Amino acid sequence: MVEALNAVYPYDLALLPEDYEKTTAPDAVQAANAARPFLNPVYPYQQPVAGDFGFPIVMPPFFNSYDFTSIHGNTLSLRLNKPLKRTAKGLQLLLGSGLSVNADGQLESSEGISEADAPLQINDGVLQLSFGEGLSVNDHGELESKGKVEAVTLPLALQDHVMSLSFGQGLQVNDQGQLEALAMVHSTSAPLKVTNNNLELALGRGLIVDDQGQLRLAPNLLWPESPLAIEQGTNHLILFYNQSLDVEDGKLTLPEPFDPLTLDGGRLRMQLAPNSGLAVTEKGSLGINWGEGIQVKEQKITLKVTPANGLAVTEQGGLNINWGNGIKVDEQKVTLKTSNEFALTENGLYLTSPLNPIEVNQHGQLGIALGYGFHAHRGYLELTPQTLWTGLPIGNNGTFHTKQDCKIFLSLTRLGPMVHGTFMLQAPQYELTTNGMREITFSFNSTGGLEQPAPVTYWGALDPPPTAKAAEIENQKRVKKRAAPDPPVEPPPKRRGDLAVLFAKVAEQAMELAKEQAVQAQPPEHVNTDWADHMNLLRFMPNTLVYPTAATIAANLQFHDTRLSLRRATLKIRLNGSPDSAYQLGFMLELVGTQSASIVTDTISFWYYAEDY
């Protein structure tokens, strides 16, 4: 019998059979092994010592999970992957087609190799390696490099043309020249610790390691109190709980509560409906948001009642209304007492049969049904103006070349489907030649409003004849204005000599000019610029179907004869025809058979179809 190291606890020497195959190591290796101390391959790597109860402490085996595995909880076994498997005869190799084991137990190929991928090739049934320049096979059949290695990459290193492997802590090269990991643990994390190069498990109160090396609860654990208990048979610590608690993923939680409660971040919270009148105070109490008319009196919710507002509380605690004339209760509902001329509906009180022209508008307001040509303004029923004009051109109101250098008169009056127009131009300081003149254009927007810059200073509606009441009010304003005395004008200071007289005349002329300009800056009384709010200005615009926009055709032009200083001329009127504005009226003079004439026209009338016709 031969003695050998037993790798199973208690790690004594096992007796092996005589025919156990044993490899004899070289003398140097045997001497090195003999000098080494006895190695226990199981944690804690030393002879077991007696514990508190006098028995040896059995620690669990320390093994690498990549090479070993645990079977049935306490048996250490090798971790196997294919092509290895366990059988009743021991560890065997799984063989596929083309492989077999001969009588000497050696693995060999039972089929010839027919094909091979480069750099391998088959010659006469022999597998050979193809290699190029720089490689050769030495006398020992080994592949070697003919040249010298000039450079390598990490973790390889090159020194004196010798290639070596660089490695750090935790790795070493053994006597056989193989790279292996050092069996030393340098650092751990709790509950593991290293003592004298041994890995240990730090145990607290209530934990022990049993004879099988397994971690268990200590038998002297204090008996738990309710709601904790020890389950019989399993010795598991359990917790008793009722239906108000639940266990989810091994954690004690609250189950989903019934409305109006909900869980918010693991905390129980009450859901309050919006506009419910309920709120949670700063102290966490449920309260009521008090509105106006509500109060708490003697810890009771009650109404705030003001008797002066017609409300009262009866002796029975009910809310009552002090009734006045015109109010009654009908079928337990407060309603109005109405006469035969009025009726109550779901929409309110209305006249049963208003006589024309009385009506109730869409806003429920009583008024007069207004037809074409009438409107309500300033509290009176008035005629809607039928004329837009520049006003009487008493002073210069137009622009020929410069501002207010001429008089322009334009009047547009609506009559049925037609608009009657009147035009006059007076610019006596200018002469018209055979070349004609530039066009005077009135441009209007999509609602009929005059666009700026305009050729005239003022543009508005002609006030219709006022009513008797309105005329009386305007007359009182004029009388009051006349009664107010003009402010005194202080005379200019007296100066000596002709120069002082000249300065006085210049100052007097400047004051008269300023007064004239101030008068011209105000619109004439017969031009009302506020009528646009009461008029449909499109009624005065040229019809875009008859006179198209952006189309200079014959239908857009009218030609009228006139006189310029007793000389014959033609006034060309253009209706629309420009893409720059929604509506346009253009006026241009042309001489007939003469060289020049002063620009002073007659009053010229023209007609066209209105836009809303």
From Swiss-Prot:
GO CC term, one of those recorded: viral capsid
Record's miscellaneous remark: All late proteins expressed from the major late promoter are produced by alternative splicing and alternative polyadenylation of the same gene giving rise to non-overlapping ORFs. A leader sequence is present in the N-terminus of all these mRNAs and is recognized by the viral shutoff protein to provide expression although conventional translation via ribosome scanning from the cap has been shut off in the host cell.
Keyword Membrane found: no
Organism: Murine adenovirus A serotype 1
Family, as annotated: Belongs to the adenoviridae fiber family.
Keyword Transferase: no
Task of the protein: Forms spikes that protrude from each vertex of the icosahedral capsid. Interacts with host receptor to provide virion initial attachment to target cell. Fiber proteins are shed during virus entry, when virus is still at the cell surface.
Domain of life: Viruses
A GO BP annotation: symbiont entry into host cell
Main location: virion
InterPro entries referenced in this protein's UniProt entry, alphabetically: Adeno_fibre, Adeno_fibre_knob, Adenobir_fibre_prot_rpt/shaft, Adenovirus_pIV-like_att, Attachment_protein_shaft_sf
Protein name (Swiss-Prot/TrEMBL): Fiber protein
Domain comment quoted from the record: The tail region anchors the fiber to penton base capsomers, whereas the shaft, built from several repeated motifs, allows the knob to protrude from the virion.
Quaternary structure (record): Homotrimer. Interacts (via N-terminal tail region) with pentons.
Region (Disordered): 474-496
Compartments it resides in: Virion; Host nucleus
Induction line: Expressed in the late phase of the viral replicative cycle.
Pfam families with a match to the protein in the record: Adeno_knob, Adeno_shaft
Keywords: Capsid protein, Host nucleus, Host-virus interaction, Late protein, Viral attachment to host adhesion receptor, Viral attachment to host cell, Virion, Virus entry into host cell
